[in-house]
Amino acid sequence: MSEQIGSASNGVMAGTPREVVVYGSAEGFTQEIVIGPHRLVADEPADMGGADEGPTPYDLLLAALGACTSMTVALYARRKSWPLQGVTARLRHSRIHAVDCAECETKEGRIDRIELNIEFAGQLSKEQQLKLLEIAKKCPVHRTLTSEVDIRTRAEWKMHAGSA
């Protein structure tokens, strides 16, 4: 059985990438994020120089992982007709010294650590809970974060009216 999730309900075929556009000014940290019909704001907390008008970029990254994990687990349980009533994912991001991570390949410098704690609600057997924990690690965002990622950054320069 395929472990992939997709939905065509938003007019985008499953697996079709949708462009995310982020608008920001050279002043402050507040960013407007546009994803199809959705509008979000990202910012930094006041103690980091931001206006605290929205979640931080790391908050959004954790939200993406948590939402994907919850959706993946719920979909799997529905397909199996298991009595899962709800999923709560709590996530934290930190940076640790590589030497403090015995299971990590990197042994120098610092590494990013994401702690993901999942709570399953429902009358699930121990075997079902263990299987759902295994499935949680197969969500597409989890796989992306733990795989090799090729980010291709390009730039465009636009002169605005009144610019020199």
Regions found by a protein language model. Name each.
Residues 72:
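Metal-dependent nuclease catalytic cores in nucleic-acid-processing enzymes
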Residues 1-63, 75-164:
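Extended beta-strand/beta-hairpin segments
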